[in-house]
């Protein structure tokens, strides 16, 4: 029997990737629904009109009276729940929901649920590869890649889901087999009233979870859990009885579980302490669902990282170049600066700037002073970053990513690394962080 009551009317609000997945899901179940989007020409409009010409669609300013016709509004993550039209419809009886809530109702296989301010995609991808190496029929997606509803299949044995705070806002009960908040730092402060509201949204991932994984070194990642709920931990310190961490023997560091060394850190192909933390988090999540260590460690040895996430580009004149364009918040940039900075013999030349989304950049000052030779700044909020850094290092302003690559190459010395880790979104200058990363990679390739 369908878990959706068929005589109720629904509206999908937002026609991007997740909105279109909702359209397919509802249409396949014969549910009555319409579509609304604040944009005059949303990305999937042509697809909707071609494949579902019978579905009513309203584009432009949201019509409250139209929304109030619905018993339930499936709100895409790109639209804030605080939008007045949504709040008015909700006050008049419409339930606000989303695609992840529907996914949770229909998923028959265990779910590994992953969120955090940073490293979500890397850890999600790693766990998915570990599960595949263990012979599991695994589906990976959510905020990363394939929308959640498009993954639903009776053939799937395990779901590995990356979830954003925006998706979790409309998720009442996820019921994951294991859930984690990898870390929390300020992000999306242009959408949330402050860090507490952002923290609460992230922690909705733990609702109904059967096990949790906690970052020992980030108190904000730890949920309030009842007695008896299994809790596994990870961190860059020595592991506890239920934990994964680092051990050192004869000058060599090892990934470890409890009192057992699992593999030398030197066997990882990805560099930096932050990537060691990602590996430990993935091990903890995989262990929670019973993945064997041999398959997980084999996956770790082969993993080369994701594009735009502290991605090594090339070496030139003794200087390594890294593309960390995905670092769209301060926490992500800090992870890269500290992770790479502690792992190289020289200094970093940092390239940062863009749309800061209302963030506080003051946390960058100390690690930049410790690990960086200079900072090259660009984008809308370059001056805000400059004010936060003060006299920590020499500051250079440029107008383009190409100029940033050229100036950084001039500043870097043999043994250094040039790191694009903007601590900002890209929308002031680019379509998305991927385009920013590609432009940087091309500029680095063109250095004479």
UniProtKB/Swiss-Prot annotation:
Localization (cell): Cytoplasm
Signal sequence extent: none
Catalysed reaction, written as an equation: UDP-N-acetyl-alpha-D-muramoyl-L-alanine + D-glutamate + ATP = UDP-N-acetyl-alpha-D-muramoyl-L-alanyl-D-glutamate + ADP + phosphate + H(+)
Residues that, per the record, bind ATP: 116-122
Keyword Cytoplasm listed: yes
GO annotation, cellular component aspect: cytoplasm
Location, primary (coarse class): cytoplasm
Entries under InterPro entries matching the protein: Mur-like_cat_sf, Mur_ligase_C, Mur_ligase_C_dom_sf, Mur_ligase_cen, MurD
GO biological process: one example: peptidoglycan biosynthetic process
Keyword ATP-binding applies: yes
Coiled-coil region: none
Pathway(s) it belongs to: Cell wall biogenesis; peptidoglycan biosynthesis
Superkingdom of the organism of origin: Bacteria
GO terms, molecular function: ATP binding; UDP-N-acetylmuramoylalanine-D-glutamate ligase activity
Record EC number: 6.3.2.9
Sorted UniProt keywords: ATP-binding, Cell cycle, Cell division, Cell shape, Cell wall biogenesis/degradation, Cytoplasm, Ligase, Nucleotide-binding, Peptidoglycan synthesis
Role: Cell wall formation. Catalyzes the addition of glutamate to the nucleotide precursor UDP-N-acetylmuramoyl-L-alanine (UMA).
Protein family: Belongs to the MurCDEF family.
Entry protein name: UDP-N-acetylmuramoylalanine--D-glutamate ligase
UniProt organism field: Pseudomonas syringae pv. tomato (strain ATCC BAA-871 / DC3000)
């Amino acid at each position: 029997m369908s878990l959706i009551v068929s005589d109720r009317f629904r509206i999908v609000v937002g026609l991007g990737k997740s909105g279109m997945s909702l359209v397919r899901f509802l249409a396949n179940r014969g549910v009555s629904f319409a579509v609304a989007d604040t944009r005059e020409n949303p990305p999937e409009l042509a697809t909707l009109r071609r494949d579902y010409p019978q579905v009513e669609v309203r584009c432009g300013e949201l019509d409250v009276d139209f929304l109030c016709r619905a018993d339930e509004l499936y709100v895409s993550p790109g639209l804030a729940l605080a939008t007045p039209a949504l709040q008015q419809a909700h006050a008049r009886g419409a339930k606000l929901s989303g695609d992840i809530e529907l996914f949770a109702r229909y998923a028959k296989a265990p779910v590994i649920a992953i969120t955090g301010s940073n490293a979500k995609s890397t850890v999600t991808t790693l766990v998915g590869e570990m599960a595949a190496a263990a012979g599991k029929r695994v589906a990976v997606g959510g905020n990363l890649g394939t929308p959640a509803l498009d993954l639903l299949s009776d053939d799937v044995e395990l779901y590995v889901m990356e979830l954003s705070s925006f998706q979790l806002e409309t998720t009442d009960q996820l019921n994951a087999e294991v859930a984690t908040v990898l870390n929390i730092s300020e992000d999306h402060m242009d959408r949330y009233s402050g860090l507490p509201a952002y923290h609460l949204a992230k922690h909705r991932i733990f609702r109904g979870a059967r096990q949790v994984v906690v970052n020992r070194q980030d108190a904000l990642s730890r949920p309030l859990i009842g007695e008896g709920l299994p809790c596994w931990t990870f961190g860059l310190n020595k592991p506890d009885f239920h934990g994964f961490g680092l051990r050192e023997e004869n000058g060599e560091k090892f990934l470890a579980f409890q009192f057992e060394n699992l593999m030398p850190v030197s066997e990882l192909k990805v560099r930096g302490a932050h990537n060691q933390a990602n590996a430990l988090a993935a091990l903890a999540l995989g262990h929670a669902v019973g993945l064997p260590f041999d398959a997980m460690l084999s996956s770790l040895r082969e993993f080369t990282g994701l594009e735009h996430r502290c991605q090594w580009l090339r070496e030139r004149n003794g200087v390594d170049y890294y593309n960390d364009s995905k670092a769209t918040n301060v926490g992500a940039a800090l992870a890269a600066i500290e992770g790479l900075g502690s792992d190289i013999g020289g200094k970093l030349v940092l390239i940062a700037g863009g749309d800061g989304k209302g963030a506080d950049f003051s946390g960058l000052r100390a690690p930049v002073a410790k690990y960086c030779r200079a900072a090259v700044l660009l984008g809308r909020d370059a001056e805000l970053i400059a004010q936060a850094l003060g006299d920590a290092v020499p500051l250079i302003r440029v107008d383009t990513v190409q100029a940033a690559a050229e100036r950084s190459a001039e500043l870097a010395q043999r043994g250094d690394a040039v790191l694009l880790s903007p601590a900002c979104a890209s929308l002031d200058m680019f379509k998305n962080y991927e385009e920013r990363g590609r432009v940087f990679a091309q500029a680095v390739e063109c250095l004479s």
